[in-house]
């Protein structure tokens, strides 16, 4: 779950309240942001992650970095769209052959990243226009990758 600092306490509480185990937080460093004089730059989002069960230490997944440095994508479909290379890295926390659920699919980046990395995936998007555009994007990019 990608959030800014203001939602960090509520997001981690909600994850645990839903019965999941909060596993930690990573950082997406976007590199640049709108400067605010007299304040720290808001150039990062937090990645809150957890599991709905045990995660043995010997799982066949790589050790991922705690900070991911990727700029915002150009020509975004959705306001909060994430860069595809970032999501291709993040989905690797899932065991090989795993299934990835994105309940806020937006432009479909997580679903596309999951499929490109060999996972199955389900995306849920409540806004019809974004769902349509995400589906078209995923289909087009998968055709190009084939």
Regions found by a protein language model. Give the residues of each.
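Short, conserved SAM-binding/catalytic segment
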Residues: 135-146
């Amino acid at each position: 779950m990608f959030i800014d600092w203001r939602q960090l306490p509520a997001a981690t509480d909600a994850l645990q309240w839903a019965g999941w185990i909060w596993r930690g937080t990573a950082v997406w460093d976007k590199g640049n942001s709108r400067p605010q004089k007299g304040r720290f730059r808001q150039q990062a989002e937090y990645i809150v992650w957890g599991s709905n069960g045990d995660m043995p230490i010997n799982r066949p997944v790589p050790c991922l970095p705690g900070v991911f440095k990727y700029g915002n994508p150009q020509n975004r479909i959705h306001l909060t769209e994430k860069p595809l290379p970032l999501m291709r890295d993040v989905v690797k926390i899932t065991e090989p052959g795993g299934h990835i659920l994105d309940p806020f699919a937006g432009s479909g980046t997580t679903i596309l990243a999951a499929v490109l990395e060999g996972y199955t995936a389900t995306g849920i998007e409540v806004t019809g226009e974004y769902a349509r555009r995400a589906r078209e994007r995923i289909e087009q990019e998968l055709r190009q990758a084939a």
